[in-house]
């Protein structure tokens, strides 16, 4: 589907809306799956208020649901400088792409038993950091600053001793979104992961939040009703929370994220398309994988690499027929994606109704089905 974009659709100000602070979910529902679902027919504009547990009642027959199987890494480290000053480091490079260097860095040799890799991350400290500064995060993790970039993004040398995923699980904190105004807790270790998350896909710094609503029971119900499943991988980057800053959104430089689509998933989607069965993206991350690969390659094919696709009104969707998604921040690229799918004015009108009806917004909030 291609939305007939107008000049107003390209203005950043066209994606602003007023959201009361108490509509931003600070915690997950008491139980996984106890979320609300707002169904929007993007052709007629009809809206239905439902429960997410009743998703099967609102999906077309024989739908193929495509979910993101990436897992959130406790990627936020709290440490100190040699002088004792406190520092924070957030690993941005997906864990599977952290490749130990064959030889020690130019700044010195690597101690026996230690590994080192050049990675990207966010650094925060009470006093400015400079190239060459060394930061410690427990006994087995440390970082040396190589180059500082914009908005805190930096290239660093990451030194570790032992198994890296285990070290982050022990020392790290889940990087909850900035609009969740509390520290991460034990409940987040479970509830900020989806039922699709795979251990060998550990490396996202944010959850693919549409997947948070699904339970094993709901998956079984959907399968029993004749729906099918497929998986893709997108390692969600911190750029997902970055606002669009350009007055004309077409000037926005989109952040890139690493994605994977297997030959098996491609074949399942091709068969669904051939049979006339709709492809339902579980979340904007799954949507970005499918549309990003199809746009870059001209067709959907197996792929492992980067995508920086930016979808806004006027974009023609090539793979995705329906979209399950949460409610998104004002002036965000994700709100623009949803507007490309269902129309900006229709989406904003739906958001206003959701606010009036008491829906919970953002990562731990309620969901929409755009069909």
Curated annotation (Swiss-Prot):
Its main location: cytoplasm. InterPro entries: QueA, QueA_dom1, QueA_dom2, QueA_sf. Keywords: Cytoplasm, Queuosine biosynthesis, S-adenosyl-L-methionine, Transferase. Coiled coil: none annotated. It catalyses: 7-aminomethyl-7-carbaguanosine(34) in tRNA + S-adenosyl-L-methionine = epoxyqueuosine(34) in tRNA + adenine + L-methionine + 2 H(+). One of its GO terms (cellular component) is cytoplasm. This is S-adenosylmethionine:tRNA ribosyltransferase-isomerase. It comes from Nitratidesulfovibrio vulgaris (strain ATCC 29579 / DSM 644 / CCUG 34227 / NCIMB 8303 / VKM B-1760 / Hildenborough) (Desulfovibrio vulgaris).
């Amino acid at each position: 589907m291609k939305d007939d974009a107008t000049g107003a659709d390209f203005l950043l100000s066209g994606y602003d809306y007023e959201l009361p602070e108490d509509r931003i979910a600070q915690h997950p529902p008491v139980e996984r799956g106890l979320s609300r679902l707002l169904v929007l027919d993007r052709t007629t504009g009809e809206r239905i208020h439902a429960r997410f547990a009743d998703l099967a009642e609102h999906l077309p027959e024989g739908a193929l649901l495509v979910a993101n199987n990436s897992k959130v890494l406790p990627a936020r480290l709290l440490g100190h400088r040699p002088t004792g000053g406190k520092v924070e480091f957030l690993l941005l490079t997906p864990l599977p792409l952290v490749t130990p260097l064959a030889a020690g860095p130019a700044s010195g040799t690597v101690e026996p038993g230690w590994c080192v890799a050049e990675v990207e991350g966010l650094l925060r400290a009470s006093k400015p950091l400079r190239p060459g500064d060394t930061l410690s995060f427990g006994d087995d993790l440390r970082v040396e600053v190589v180059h500082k970039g914009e908005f805190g993004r930096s290239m660093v040398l990451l030194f570790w001793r032992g198994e890296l995923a285990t070290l982050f699980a022990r020392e790290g904190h889940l990087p909850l979104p900035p609009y969740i105004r509390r520290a991460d807790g034990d409940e987040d270790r479970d509830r900020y992961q989806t039922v699709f998350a795979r251990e060998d896909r550990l490396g996202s710094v944010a959850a693919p939040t549409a997947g948070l609503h699904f339970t094993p029971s709901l998956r079984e119900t959907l399968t029993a009703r004749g729906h099918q499943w497929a998986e893709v991988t997108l390692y969600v980057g911190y750029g997902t929370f970055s606002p669009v800053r350009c007055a004309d959104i077409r000037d926005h430089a989109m952040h890139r994220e690493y994605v994977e689509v297997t030959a098996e998933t491609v074949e399942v989607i091709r068969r669904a398309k051939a049979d006339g069965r709709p492809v339902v993206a579980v979340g904007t991350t799954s949507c970005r994988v499918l549309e990003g690969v199809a746009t870059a390659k001209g067709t959907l094919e197996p792929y492992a690499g980067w995508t920086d696709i930016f979808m806004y009104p006027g974009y023609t969707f090539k793979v995705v027929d329906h979209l399950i998604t949460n409610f998104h921040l004002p002036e965000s690229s994700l709100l623009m994606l949803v507007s490309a799918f269902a129309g900006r004015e229709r989406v904003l009108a739906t958001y206003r109704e959701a606010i009036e009806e008491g829906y919970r917004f953002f990562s731990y909030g309620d969901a929409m089905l755009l069909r």
